[in-house]
């Protein structure tokens, strides 16, 4: 099903998917904001993910469960190479295509279409206009990797893309990397932002975001979600984890909090941590771009942090990294964005993608 969007180069699509994947048994219960604070403490403790403070998961993966989802996406441009964008935690697809006035310089989608690419920009399941799902049993990392795998197939077989690029930001970067590892022959290039390949610096993000139960935080907007969906406490907490002064316009942070920000399920982060990261299976040429002042990926200073990625992406035909861009975590929403987009397109051109 498609409809024409407000942008002439885009159509709104609804993509039905059937996903069969094993699930973890999440044993974290969040009923109210007191529980959200308690979970935050557990996730940021010095002994987190040790026997003294284990992941909130009971046992390993169970049997495969088959589920039907609908993914909402914008399909933009007519280029034979399709870029599939995957957003991060506390975000939506609007991160890649802001809809506020005078924001064209921040729209990766518009820049990519102008550069001759097509873009499949989607809301992850549980987010925005995609299927509402259970925050514990469906909102799990390995399920979302399989959703992206299915979208790669959609790009190739339904949208008839000749080449496919995966572009992931933050949590979406991990999803994109693992999807590229699983669908090696179908992915021609991989671009990662808000990503360092380690969660060593996860605690400042989790504590600084000020997690709150989304349905209590904004009942009119998120009252339909179960209590295991979390969001950030206010625009200033969001700014701390996503932006770096003086390299952004405050209106972009305000818009992100009011419009683009979307909750995440309590099962997503523990299952990311519990999943083996098979970065060594990625064969596609890979570009990693980092705002220097990224809190969650690098603890606030990324210079040197990406140096060890060569030890992880051992099979990538090309691995290029940039660790000192004047920006925070939400790289594309900083004033450096146009130059970042040019860097991405230059890299893809060098790889004949």
PLM features per residue range, with description:
Residues 137-159:
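Alpha/beta-hydrolase active-site loop
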Residues 318-353:
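Catalytic active-site module of serine/aspartate enzymes centered on a nucleophile-bearing elbow/loop
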Residues 78-117:
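Short, surface-exposed "cap/lid" segments of acyl-processing enzymes
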Residues 54-55, 205-301:
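Alpha/beta-hydrolase
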Residues 292-322, 327:
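Conserved loop-alpha-helix segment in the C-terminal half of the alpha/beta-hydrolase fold
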Residues 162-198:
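Conserved hydrolase catalytic core segment
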Residues 94-95, 123-138, 329-330:
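Glycine-rich "HGGG/HGxG" loop immediately N-terminal to the catalytic nucleophile
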Residues 2-78:
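N-terminal cap/lid segment of alpha/beta-hydrolase-fold proteins
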């Amino acid at each position: 099903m498609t409809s024409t969007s407000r942008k002439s180069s885009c159509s709104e699509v609804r993509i039905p998917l059937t996903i069969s994947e094993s699930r973890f048994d999440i044993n974290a219960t969040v009923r109210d904001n007191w529980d959200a604070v308690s979970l935050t403490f557990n996730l940021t403790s010095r002994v987190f993910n040790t026997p003294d403070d284990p992941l909130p998961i009971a046992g390993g993966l169970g049997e495969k469960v088959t589920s039907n989802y609908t993914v909402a996406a914008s399909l933009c441009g007519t280029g034979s190479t399709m870029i599939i964008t995957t957003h991060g935690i506390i975000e939506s697809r609007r991160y890649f295509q802001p809809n506020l006035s005078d924001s064209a310089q921040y729209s990766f989608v518009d820049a990519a279409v102008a550069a001759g690419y097509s873009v499949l920009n989607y809301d992850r399941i549980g987010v925005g206009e995609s299927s509402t799902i259970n925050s514990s049993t469906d909102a799990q990392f390995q399920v979302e990797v399989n959703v992206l795998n299915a979208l790669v197939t959609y790009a190739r077989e339904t949208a008839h893309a000749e080449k496919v690029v995966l572009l992931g930001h933050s949590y979406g970067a991990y999803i994109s990397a693992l999807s590229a590892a699983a669908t090696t022959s179908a992915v021609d290039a991989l671009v990662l932002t808000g990503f360092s390949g380690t969660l060593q610096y996860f605690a400042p993000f989790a504590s600084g975001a000020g997690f709150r139960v989304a349905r209590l935080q904004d009942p009119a907007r998120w009252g339909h979600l179960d209590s295991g969906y979390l969001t950030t406490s206010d625009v200033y907490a969001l700014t701390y984890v996503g932006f770096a002064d003086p390299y952004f316009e405050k209106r972009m942070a305000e818009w992100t909090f009011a419009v683009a920000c979307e909750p995440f399920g309590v099962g997503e982060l523990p299952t990311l941590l519990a999943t083996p990261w098979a970065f060594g299976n990625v064969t596609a040429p890979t570009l990693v771009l980092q705002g220097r002042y990224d809190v969650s990926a690098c603890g606030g200073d990324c210079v040197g942090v990406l140096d060890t990625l060569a030890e992880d992406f051992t099979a990538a035909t090309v691995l290029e990294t940039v660790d000192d861009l004047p920006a925070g975590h939400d790289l594309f929403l900083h004033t450096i964005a146009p130059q970042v987009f040019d860097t991405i397109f230059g890299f893809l051109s060098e790889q004949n993608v």
